[in-house]
Amino acid sequence: MRYQNMFETLKKQDKMAFIPFVTLGDPNYEWSFEIIKTLIDSGVSALELGFAFSDPVADGVTIQASHLRALKHASMAKNFQLLRALRDYNPHIPIGLLAYANLIFSYGVDGFYAQIKECGVDSVLIADMPLIEKELVIKSAQKHQIKQIFIASPNASVKDLEQVATHSQGYIYTLARSGVTGASHTLKNDASAIIKTLKTFSSTPALLGFGISKKEHITNAKGMGADGVICGSALVKIIEENLNNENAMLEKIKGFIGGMIF
């Protein structure tokens, strides 16, 4: 219900959802908690939180570096502990996870979904799992009331987009471009055709990701019919550039979010 409540509230206000992405434990768990609390307090719509992985193939250099920083001290147990603390901090904000398949399958699919439900997580997006393999996780997601998110890519066929729209819950992660994550100066591709196709099959909100780094990108995304955006690399870059000064990092994050959503 958290996603539904969030989107309904935003619709009444004629606002776009703004969802930041950061990697759990980057640059360490203490700072990570403060970073994510700052995001919540700055008024973001929801959270997209990554589990650090040694081979993050869907990510560009900025987010790859954040995985490597977090991996120095990351563990599944610490991730779950941090998620619980975040849910205790804010009982209402939707929390989504972005993970790579190997982490989930190594842990055990059903055990993973049971654990994240207990932590107060709302959704999971598996970055490197094609839609054709959805049956491997969908039963566990439904059993534990976790919304499974799927990716709509620019190269997907209409049939694939129908499958994505039909099976995605919470929202649909719509790629602004193909390739890997990374901040862009401009949104070069027009995703309006993909979003229009998705909306013919489902009323599930479509969020645009990959390359969102400026306020104008949010305006562009709205013009394409998107219901919101996911912003990762531009935010993670702020973390990377302020590793020696936590206060400066948090102030810059606050300023960045304020400039994007108000």
Curated annotation (Swiss-Prot):
Catalysed transformations (reactions): (1S,2R)-1-C-(indol-3-yl)glycerol 3-phosphate + L-serine = D-glyceraldehyde 3-phosphate + L-tryptophan + H2O
Cited InterPro entries: Aldolase_TIM, RibuloseP-bd_barrel, Trp_synthase_alpha_AS, Trp_synthase_suA
PROSITE patterns (alphabetical): TRP_SYNTHASE_ALPHA
EC number: 4.2.1.20
Pathway: Amino-acid biosynthesis; L-tryptophan biosynthesis; L-tryptophan from chorismate: step 5/5
PANTHER family attached to this UniProt entry: TRYPTOPHAN SYNTHASE ALPHA CHAIN, CHLOROPLASTIC, TRYPTOPHAN SYNTHASE, ALPHA CHAIN
Record's keyword terms, sorted: Amino-acid biosynthesis, Aromatic amino acid biosynthesis, Lyase, Tryptophan biosynthesis
Disulfide pattern: none
Function comment: The alpha subunit is responsible for the aldol cleavage of indoleglycerol phosphate to indole and glyceraldehyde 3-phosphate.
GO molecular function, one term: tryptophan synthase activity
Subunit structure: Tetramer of two alpha and two beta chains.
Cellular component, GO, one term: cytosol
Family to which this protein belongs: Belongs to the TrpA family.
Gene3D superfamilies in the cross-refs: Aldolase class I
Name by which UniProt lists this protein: Tryptophan synthase alpha chain
Domain of life: Bacteria
